[in-house]
Amino acid sequence: MSETENKTTTETPTTTDSTVTTKEVKVPKATSKGNDDYFFVKNVKNQLSNTRTRATVDRLAPTPPLSQAAKRKLIDTKERKEKKEKKEKEPKEPKEPKEKAKKKAKTEKKKDDGDEEEDEEKEEDEEQKEEQSQEEDSEESEEEQNSDEDKKKKKKQAKKVAKKETEPKKKEAKPKKEAKPKKETTKKEKEATTTSSDSTEKKEKEEKPKKEKKISKKDQAAAEKKKDGDDSTTTTATATTTTDDSTENKEEKKDKKTTKKPAAAEKKKVKKDGDDDETAAAATEEKKDEEKSEEKEKKETKKPAAPKKPAAAEKKKTAANPTDKKDGENKDVTPSDDKPAATTTTTTAAAATTTEEPKEKITKPAADKKKAPANKKAEKDQSSSDESANKETTTATTTTTNKDATAPTTTTNKDATAPTTTTTKDNVDEASVKKTANSAPKKEAAKNKSK
């Protein structure tokens, strides 16, 4: 193991004595770093080094020479200490009570105030004396000036008098200018000037209230809104004006219609008057002519009705488009190519039912007649589009095939039992519709056979 050696360490105590005390401390000798003794020795050395304080080090170290600044500081500190000691040694005067000190201060202030007032009075007296002396001086100077001015004026007047006496009168009386005669204004000129001035005044007056009215209208509208709380009053006024206009237009139309009178009534009137039969006949003929002319004028004013298409064109249309249906019919019908075309039969409910019931004449109002040309264009466009569709799909017809071939007749319309009336816009005959409906399946059968 490790051997122990006795080592002596010197420590300086914190006391003022210069003697150094020694202590004997046993420190183990460390042989290798791996042993625990090595760390123990290290810790002991650290402890010994920490035991020395700053004071002991300063005492042992030699003192350096002082600088001049340090010497001055030392001198100043010494002088201050001496002054303090002297003050402490001197006997202190007893302090007066606070009340007495206050009274003394007040009396001193009063004395000072009194002295100041006396000084102010003296200054005021001196100022007044100076002002009086200045006024007296100014009066004397004014009097002197006035006397000098009077003397000068007198001298000037004397000179003027001497000149007048010596110099003759050279100035002659000049003839006065004759006053030009004023132009006499005629009555027309006066009226023109008055009218122009009046017109300008009127314009100015009219312009001013216009500007005020613009502002006043806005103010009135705002006031009305505040009073009523709603804008209903303003809207009703506009509505009433529009209705009045419409009623006036209607009354004018009624008056035009009521102007016509029947010829029979006119004949009776003529006979009542007691005129001859010839005169009555002539009067009735004239009135008839007038009525005819009026009717012609009305017809010219009205828009011309749409020209009717011929029945042949309609037949071509229906033959090309046998699948055109109304709103009530079923449009989605799928053709079947499984069975031969001999067993297929088509029945159009519209064509069958129209033969049983009589025709119904539908009188269209004037508004529909006006719309006729617009509808015509739409129909033409539809027909052209339908024809192109039928060219592409030739098999899409209203036909149904019977698989057993025992019941050849089948209906495609769900509402076939209900009687339906067809009203064509172009007044096409129903017979042509029937023919086209019957001819369509025959054509299809021929096509299927050829295939």
Curated annotation (Swiss-Prot):
Comp. bias (Low complexity): 9-22, 232-244, 341-355, 393-425
Residue ranges, compositional bias (Acidic residues): 114-147
Region of interest: Disordered: 1-451
Highest rank taxon of the organism: Eukaryota
Polar residues compositional bias, start-end: 44-54
Source organism of this protein record: Dictyostelium discoideum
The protein's name in its UniProt record: Uncharacterized protein DDB_G0286299
Biased composition, class Basic and acidic residues, residue ranges: 73-99, 163-192, 199-210, 217-230, 284-303, 311-340, 356-383, 441-451
Regions of compositional bias (Basic residues) in chain numbering: 152-162
